[in-house]
A protein has these predicted regions:
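Non-catalytic DNA-recognition/assembly elements of restriction-modification systems
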Residues: 1-60, 188-300, 428-505
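Sequence-specific dsDNA recognition surfaces
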Residues: 39-61, 76-107, 279-300, 314-341
């Protein structure tokens, strides 16, 4: 975590050293420096005391099962790049009904992590009567200014306070209830107006995150329905692999011979409008840039934007929705392998392989690393077709097909030799348009003047048109604006409460 408000004193009093048992570690004397002292401890903002009824409970791995309506939420669901919980096979586990503890989780509840990723927080977008949280989390009983407090806890001003309060552990850190001693800084002037502005923006982000999930599901359902409703007369029958099939794949340790894979593959090949491979569609595959010193020499890495640096879009930073959770920057004097508009990055390795993204805007210096496969059209780029390819790969990933191709340990990798066995249905232009617009709609813009009174309506109009790409882009701009306003509050400056920043979309 890059510290913005933490300072180390140039000198200390002997009495301070004596009080701390003569420990001379500089970190022990660090403190946060907020120009605005109008803060209230988090514990004073709770609607009631934080008793054990608000703390989660552990169930033990013996209670994990494959099928159950009851679920167990772990701290991995709380991520700094999301407002809503990130549900996946590692963060949300199914458990035996007998181990379930009722926690009455409701829409709008704030869930904060006290262990591991300490201080991370999420807000629930729905009621979850059959979900419980782990003992590493608390449900915060907050009613007044809930969304403002949520935004402040997400901000580095809160995290830096907590970092100084929590002992530095060797591996996992435990905050217990020390987070209650952190201050939430409030505006000195125009308090209600500023809080209303931030809460309006927070609610907009929550709406957009939810819509991204909904539109991604629509993409998957559209593809599945199109294939299922346009089958030829042939009927699938499973057969064991032949000798020639075994020789062709040269593998015995694979599920590609199983009925599950063969049935999915059959439906694609049985699509009445035909199918094609990537090569037949005019695309080629290549590995991303090798960033090792032996290949490109020394580089400078930065988490912040720097002019003339390459934008580093790594597969591990991609979400399953085709967005980027974060980027880093790399300075290097060599001419590296850049990505152009209409090209894809596909994460081919690890337990989360199969995540991908399309480069929508023309950018000067975007690169990925060798763990990513780049998919590019040999001739003129076709953005709509590239988006369909990305969305169909998402569909295969959602069905577990990408994992079935994997070779090797630690999640395995999708070797390039297997891409000739991945078939893409020849969807009509109309269907491709429908799928493509759910991911990227170039007609979605904030092209009206608006203020606090009209923002909600105009934001709703934008959201209804926007694809996943536009929702994510606007969401990131709004999050940056929220951080900018909170920073101004902490520094005791007058924040600019405008919406002009959205006109770039």
């Amino acid at each position: 975590m890059q510290k913005r408000y933490t300072i180390t004193p140039e000198f200390i009093k002997f009495s301070d050293i004596n009080k701390d048992d003569f420990i001379l570690s500089s970190s022990l004397y660090e403190k946060v420096n907020f120009k605005n002292t109008n803060g209230i401890f988090l514990k004073e903002l709770l609607s009631c005391s934080l008793s054990n009824e608000f703390k989660g409970s552990d169930v033990g791995s013996d209670n994990y099962v494959d099928q159950s309506p009851y679920t167990f939420l772990r701290t991995k669901a709380l991520q700094d790049f999301n407002y809503l919980p990130d549900f996946n096979k590692e963060s949300l586990l199914r458990i035996k009904p007998s181990s379930f503890k009722e926690m009455n989780l409701k829409k709008g509840d704030l869930i904060l992590s006290k262990d591991s990723n300490i201080g991370e927080i999420t807000i629930l977008d729905d009621d979850y009567p059959k979900m419980m949280i782990s003992s590493a989390m608390y449900k915060l009983p907050i009613e007044k200014d809930k969304y403002y407090i949520f935004a402040f806890i997400k901000h580095s001003a809160f995290r830096e306070q907590l970092d100084l309060l929590v002992p530095k552990g060797a591996t996992i850190r435990h905050a217990k209830t020390l987070f209650l001693g952190c201050s939430i800084i409030f505006p000195k002037k125009n308090r209600e107006k500023i809080i209303d502005y931030i809460e309006t923006l927070v609610k907009s982000v929550i709406k957009k995150e939810k819509l991204i999930k909904i539109k991604h599901e629509k993409i998957l359902h559209s593809i599945e329905n199109e294939i299922a409703s346009n089958q030829k007369d042939e009927v699938f029958t499973f057969s064991q692999p032949t000798i020639s099939e075994l020789k062709k794949k040269n593998r015995l340790d694979t599920n590609l011979y199983g009925s599950y894979f063969k049935e999915i593959n059959f439906k694609i090949k049985n699509y009445k409008y035909g199918y094609s491979t990537l090569k037949e569609l005019g695309y080629e595959l290549s590995r991303g840039q090798n960033l090792q010193i032996s290949n490109i020499g020394r580089s400078i890495y930065s988490k912040r934007y720097r002019s003339n640096f390459y934008e580093l879009m790594l597969p591990k930073f991609l979400s399953k929705y085709g967005t980027v959770n974060k980027v880093e920057y790399l300075g290097n004097s060599n001419k590296l392998k850049i990505l152009k508009k209409g090209e894809l990055i596909f994460g081919a390795e690890g337990f989360e392989k199969g995540r991908s993204i399309v480069i929508i805007d023309e950018k000067e210096k975007v690169i990925t690393n060798i763990h990513g496969i780049t998919i590019r059209k040999k001739r003129e780029q076709n953005l709509k077709q590239a988006i369909f390819i990305k969305c169909f790969l998402d569909f295969l990933r959602s069905k577990g097909v990408i994992d079935l191709f994997a070779v090797g340990g630690n999640g395995g990798s999708l070797a390039q030799k297997y891409w000739d066995e991945i078939y893409f249905p020849n969807l009509s232009e109309i269907v491709q348009d429908t799928v493509s617009n759910l991911y990227h709609n170039p007609e979605a813009h904030y092209n009206k003047e608006f203020d606090m009174a009209t923002f909600y309506q105009i934001d709703e109009e934008f959201n209804s048109k926007a694809g996943i790409y536009e929702l994510d882009k606007s969401m990131k701009l709004i999050k940056n604006k929220i951080d900018e306003v909170i920073d101004a509050i902490v520094q005791d400056n007058d924040p600019q409460l405008t919406f002009d920043f959205l006109k770039t979309i």
